[in-house]
Amino acid sequence: LGTATAYPAWSPRENRVITLEDRVLNCFMRSCNGTRPPLGSEVSVAVTTYVTSLSQGQSLRMNSKRPVGPGAIKLLAVKPDQADINRGASLYHSRCAECHQKDGQGDKDNPPVWGERSYNDGAGLSSVENLAAWLKVAMPLDDTNLSDQQALDIAVYVNSQKRPHFDLLKHLPTKAKLGEYNASPTK
């Protein structure tokens, strides 16, 4: 809720101001490991409209350095070099596998967390620090009680698994369908 209140915003990755629609479309490429829909396409407008509807009544939260919505997640105090991958594996199997499956592939209600259908190595969650911070505030669903160390251990385990490589040019539609893109095609 409130995500739309952070846009337009400066994006260091794209090195320019982006709109909510830009952000949504870029998630198709990185977090969903798919092709970026064209700007103004039916799916683009539908998803952006939905996200905006979830932000109704929220105050605008502009930030000149990066997008910051009401749910902005602060990085944890623990650092990746303090992680224990074996402890992370054990925690994953006892706390996460019920929904995301032992093999990390998820099911019809829960997304995969590694493998060919998961987020790629260009997604924000492919950073151990980002994933740990997100796990701390969002997982397990409806019972967010992981310690900072547990979130970090699970993050290092999950991100040690195979996932698709992000290649920007392979995630863009053809030039004829692209419309305006918000970054250099070399990033």
Residues of each region from the PLM?
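Short, solvent-exposed loop/turn and secondary-structure capping segments
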Residues: Q58-N63, K108-N110, F166-L172
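Post-cleavage N-terminal segment of exported redox proteins
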Residues: P12-I85, Q161
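A cross-kingdom marker for long, charged
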Residues: K162-K187
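Active-site/pore-lining binding-face segments in mid-to-C-terminal subdomains
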Residues: Y119-H165
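Sequence/structural segment immediately N-terminal to covalent heme-attachment motifs in c-type
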Residues: P67-N110, V128-N130
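Gly/Gly-Pro-rich "capping" loops immediately C-terminal to redox-active cysteine motifs
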Residues: L1-R23, Q105-V137
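Detector for the c-type heme attachment site
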Residues: T52, C99-Q105, S118, N159-K162
